[in-house]
Structure formats: structure tokens, C-alpha cells
């Protein structure tokens, strides 16, 4: 779809307006606006230092939970593996759906990034949403959604008539860019630059004279 906002609207059409949608508070305001514009009832759930507060989550009326496990906006919180398991257990106990909004996760500073909820899910309760607007360019307006198998037939029946909002040529170019390894190399360069930027901001200028900038900003393919 043409960006994540378009996909948020499809989520409501797919899952229904008769559900309560739980959202992070504070969170990305446009998510609430899109859900509300599509007729969904939103329940704001307070954040702790590791995601949505556990007590608030246990009392929630929501049957759909929209979460941003990595760098939640505006708090910047990244949920732990234990919290991600808690979300999955919550969904399993209520037969609920999790919307994993994984924006910005490509830029994790951990050598071994945390697993996505979608990859941890064994019950088919996670819808994965991401976009290329940060990793490539905002002007591309390309987002994507990965559905669990149990929702695929429902999607085909209720929303399968929609034409894709991203031009076929753009999709083809991006597919080639990914399949030939350029996207991964591009991300590696961005991560190195991000690491250097963080490093330089936290080191005195006198210490930087010993650092090889040529290595950090290498123009090679890796």
C-alpha cells in the first residue's frame, strides 16, 4: 500500500468496526486518527518503561492491540523479549489480534535484534505492518502488511477487489533491489553511519583524531 496510513484503514475494514482497538498512550497520533476516521472505537492504554502497562493491559476492553515494539513514538521505548511474550499471551487469552507496527526496526543498534512478534507468533494472531519510508525514502510511499494464514481468505473475500495503490513498476524495481542484495547493503551502510553519528556525539573531539573515518563511511558494497 501507499504508506502505513493506508494500511491502518485496511486493518479496520478487515477486522471490523465493532471491535475496540487498544493504542499506546502516548503514541503516534495519526494511528488513532485513521482508526477513528474509519469508525473504530479506540482505547488509550498508558505506557510504562517497557511498553503498555501490564495492569492497564489486563483491564483493557480491546480485542485488537496496535503496538510499536521498536522505538515507539514519542517515548522511544523498545519492548523487551519478555514484554513481547506478554503481548502474545494476552492475545492468546482473549482470542485477540496484535497489530505489530515495526517502523524503524531496521536500525536496531543491537548486534542481535529482538525477534518480531510476527516471528514469535504460533497462533496466527499477529498482523505485521512496516514501510520503506525511513529505510529508503519518504517520497516512495511504500508500505506492506503481512497477514497470518487464518486471515488470508477473509482478506481475499472482503478486500481482494482493491487495486494495489503502488505502481507495478515501482514494485518491480523494489523487488529487484531487495532480491539482488542491494537493500541489505544499503541498510548496512545506514547502520554504520548511524553508529558513527552516535559515537561522535558522545566522544570529545580530541578523541576522534584516532578514528578512521574512511572505514566507517566506506563506499564499498558492504
Which sequence ranges carry the predicted segments?
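Hydrophobic residues in beta-strands of the RecA-like P-loop NTPase core, especially within AAA+ ATPase
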Residues: 23, 99-100
